[in-house]
Design a protein with these regions (language model features):
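Conserved N-terminal alpha-helix of the aminotransferase class I/II PLP-enzyme fold
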Residues: 62-108, 115, 130, 138
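A glycine-/small-polar-enriched, mobile loop at the entrance of the PLP active site in fold-type I
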Residues: 32-83
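Conserved PLP-binding catalytic core of the aspartate aminotransferase-like
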Residues: 313-344
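Single conserved hydrophobic/aromatic residue that forms the stacking wall/gate
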Residues: 1-15
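Active-site phosphate-binding strand-loop segment of PLP-dependent enzymes
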Residues: 39, 139, 150-206
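Active-site C-terminal subdomain of aminotransferase-like
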Residues: 223-304, 318, 387-389
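PLP-dependent aminotransferase-like
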Residues: 106-174
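PLP-dependent enzyme catalytic core of the Aspartate aminotransferase-like
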Residues: 27-33, 346, 359-389
Length: 389
């Protein structure tokens, strides 16, 4: 029996009680829900337990990762291990820099044109949802940003067909959002942009399946969906793209500065990078990105098959462009949608409400969502349909 509390007890710290025992053991009755949030999202339970066990004393250092200096030897090993694992899992070539930054994916909307719209002062954008739309609007502040294709005409329910002839030959880069979190669409094929550098926001499909990094000049994403808690943004940039930022580029938005400093120009989000390392170790243990893709396809198929055969629920995306990560769906009634969300929450299926701009429902089934969670959702949807038909 644990006789002292976790908070405010020097004895607990000095005696080095196992935090995992305090949190997960004893008489504490845990009740974990299935969290379908688009982000921040579920983390693997194995990762949470590992982090809990190391909370007070990381590998005999006598301190939490939250407390240690980002320039200490022990933390240097954490961030270097995270980068090594990411490079191995994604097969990132040596001529690409990996940056662990702050500011979220949204900050990159400005950083990208400031760093890369530096030749013709032109950039081509494909608008497939709110995040691509926001990135495009930001780029327009800095140069000749052009929307070369859009799926806004059908509420972003599909990915436009692209041909390299659509892109301006002198554009400094082409920009896409690989997976559209709100609308549930994804590029199943990487666009052919010829010699024009391709940049992609992969926030909501990061590490969900293999991707050919060499097809891109830059990949980036917020970590709070598939990689870690909120607070970390990972950028993967081909080295030849660096070093030509505009003179007006703020220091903290200059990728070359962060690359030269190995992501330590200022204090990084240390604990979030540590959790990222644990998640990468978890993915490696499962068998890498090919195995992760198999897991994700199995989960998505279960949910899409139900939607395709339901008389009450229907998906909102054309089948050929469906995302493995984000599955939006609706009924024919706003009242029924609201009732479904309320009852699902009571049954431990939380954060199924669709984005405020589109309504309905959305199940985000990222890497950490187990098959059992999707199965429970589908069973609940089936029961709900029978009870409300």
């Amino acid at each position: 029996e644990i006789s002292c509390s976790l908070v405010g007890s020097e004895m607990c710290i000095r005696d080095r009680y196992n935090v995992a025992e305090i949190i997960f053991g004893g008489n504490i009755n845990m009740s974990r829900v299935y969290n379908f949030s688009a982000g921040p999202s579920m983390l693997p339970e194995e990762v949470l337990k590992k982090a809990a066990s190391e909370m007070l004393d990381y590998e005999g250092s006598g301190q939490s990762v939250m407390e240690m200096s980002h320039r200490s030897k022990v933390y240097d090993n954490i961030i270097k291990t995270a980068e090594r694992l990411l490079r191995e899992l994604m097969n990132i070539p040596d001529n690409y820099k990996v940056l662990f930054l702050q500011g979220g994916a949204s900050t990159q909307f400005a950083a990208i044109p400031l760093n890369f719209m530096n030749g013709s002062n032109k950039a081509d954008y494909v608008i497939t949802g709110q995040w691509a739309k926001k990135a495009f609007a930001e780029a327009q502040k800095y140069g000749d940003a052009k929307a070369v294709a859009s799926s806004a005409d059908k509420t972003f329910s599909y990915i436009p067909k692209l041909d390299k002839s659509m892109f301006r030959s002198d554009a400094d880069y082409v920009y896409i959002c690989m997976n559209n979190t709100i609308y549930g669409t994804v590029y199943h094929e990487i666009p052919d942009t010829g010699d024009i550098p391709l940049i992609a926001d992969i926030s909501s499909c990061f590490l969900s399946e293999p991707i050919d990094v060499t097809k891109f000049a830059m990949l980036y994403g917020g970590a709070q969906k598939n990689v870690a808690p909120a607070g970390l943004t990972i950028c993967i940039i081909r080295e030849d793209m660096l070093g030509n930022a505009r003179d007006i580029t703020p220091t903290m938005l200059n990728y070359k500065i962060h690359a030269d400093a190995n992501s330590l120009y200022n204090t990084p989000p240390c604990y979030t990078i540590y959790i990222c390392k644990l998640v990468l170790e978890w993915i490696e243990k499962l068998g890498g990105l090919e195995k992760m893709k198999e897991r994700n396809e199995k989960k998505a198929k279960l949910l899409y098959d139900f939607l395709d055969n339901s008389k009450m629920f229907r998906g909102t995306v054309v089948p050929e462009d469906r995302s493995l990560m984000n599955v939006p769906f609706v009924t024919d009634s706003d009242e029924l949608n609201a009732k479904f969300i309320e009852e699902a929450t009571k049954n431990g299926l939380v954060n199924l409400k669709g984005h405020r701009t589109v309504g309905g429902m959305r199940a985000s089934i990222y890497n950490a969502m187990p098959y059992d969670g999707v199965e429970k959702l589908v069973n609940f949807m089936s029961d709900f349909e029978k009870a409300n038909s």
